[in-house]
Regions:
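Basic nucleic-acid-binding interfaces
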Residues: 1-32, 38-80
Length: 80
């Protein structure tokens, strides 16, 4: 068995909590379509658009997709 650093786990977050973290890092909510909040951030000539489901608990795969699309560091969404 290998021993090494323990990888921090992602927190269980709601869609609103994820939007709050994203807003603290330059994203803004531009609209809502159904149960999805649409977050955007302008980076140079590019606009990054990330839909975030407004659910009480986001599934880990969904959260990982949001992290990947947003370009934010995973550490913002991990347990402390």
């Amino acid at each position: 068995m290998r021993r090494g650093r323990k990888v921090p786990r992602l927190r269980v977050l709601s869609g609103r909590q994820v939007c709050k973290i994203m807003a603290e890092h330059g994203f803004e909510q531009v609209r809502q379509k159904g149960s999805h909040l649409i977050m955007q951030k302008r980076i140079g000539n590019t606009t990054v658009t990330v839909p975030v489901p407004d659910h009480d608990e986001l599934r880990m795969g969904t959260l990982l997709g949001i992290i990947r699309q947003s370009g934010l560091p995973r550490s913002l969404f991990e347990t402390e």
